[in-house]
């Protein structure tokens, strides 16, 4: 099926048996995460990487100026007070992301061989997809992000959402999406949504959230996070 989201694609070097779809953050594009995808590509010879580009829309946080964004953001200091979230924009983006997933399914890749992930705003969309989708994905990657629509998300959850494995990474010096929002989000998933938090040192479990903190890391990624993500992906796509 055709997809409405423009995207970059890195084809696997061997037979295609799995797909990773990764959503960038506010103001970025798929090109921003291309170096990371290329870094991981050689370790996953059967994986296709898809890096979508967000549409350009007016963003309240940017004084109404248009920029690449998955949904409108009004503030960054109240991310866990979700009643002002752009629910309509989020749900529209979910449909577009699901088109990408469906295209992979139509090409012969099972849902349980597809990982969806994202950074910051893209991570929030990935988490929202995980909680509401009827698809049983191989896993979800949430980097430097938060749980959106937390005032109503429990009522929106699919019955198998908590069975999807999660890798969650966040830097302790994040000046954009404060580290405490990441901590609170993981606590929310455990306490309100029934997720299982993995013990420190556990690489992967199905189901389970692997939560990794990176001391001193700002709103970005780091080599250790990429290594941790690689070890998690190895298990998720085994």
Swiss-Prot record:
Reaction catalysed by this enzyme: S-hexadecanoyl-L-cysteinyl-[protein] + H2O = L-cysteinyl-[protein] + hexadecanoate + H(+)
Active site: 120, 174, 219
Nucleus among keywords: yes
Family according to the record: Belongs to the AB hydrolase superfamily. AB hydrolase 2 family.
Protein name: Acyl-protein thioesterase 1
Coiled coil (UniProt feature): none
Catalytic EC class: hydrolase
Species name: Cryptococcus neoformans var. neoformans serotype D (strain JEC21 / ATCC MYA-565)
Matches recorded under InterPro entries: AB_hydrolase_fold, LYPA1-2/EST-like, PLipase/COase/thioEstase
GO CC term, one of those recorded: nucleus
GO molecular function: carboxylic ester hydrolase activity; palmitoyl-(protein) hydrolase activity
EC number(s) from the headed UniProt entry: 3.1.2.-, 3.1.2.22
């Amino acid at each position: 099926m055709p997809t409405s989201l423009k995207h970059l694609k890195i084809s696997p070097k061997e037979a295609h048996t799995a797909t990773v779809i990764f959503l960038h953050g506010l103001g970025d594009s798929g090109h921003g995460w291309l170096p990371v995808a290329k870094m991981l590509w050689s370790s996953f010879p059967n994986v296709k990487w898809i890096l979508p580009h967000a549409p350009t829309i007016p963003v309240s946080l940017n004084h109404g100026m248009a920029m690449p964004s998955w949904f409108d953001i009004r503030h960054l200091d109240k991310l866990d007070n979700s009643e002002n979230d752009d629910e309509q924009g989020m749900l529209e983006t979910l449909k577009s992301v699901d088109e990408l997933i469906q295209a992979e399914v139509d090409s012969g890749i099972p849902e349980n061989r597809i990982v969806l992930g994202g950074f910051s705003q893209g991570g929030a969309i990935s988490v929202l997809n995980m909680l509401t989708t009827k698809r049983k994905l191989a896993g979800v990657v949430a980097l430097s992000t938060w749980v959106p629509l937390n005032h109503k998300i429990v009522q929106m959850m699919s019955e198998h959402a908590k069975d999807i494995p999660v890798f969650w990474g966040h830097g302790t010096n994040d000046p954009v999406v404060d580290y405490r929002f990441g901590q609170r989000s993981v606590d929310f998933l455990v306490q309100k949504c029934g997720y299982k938090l993995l013990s420190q040192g556990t690489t992967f479990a199905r189901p389970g959230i692997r939560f990794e903190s990176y001391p001193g890391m700002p709103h970005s990624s780091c080599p250790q996070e990429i290594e941790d993500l690689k070890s998690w992906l190895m298990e998720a796509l085994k």
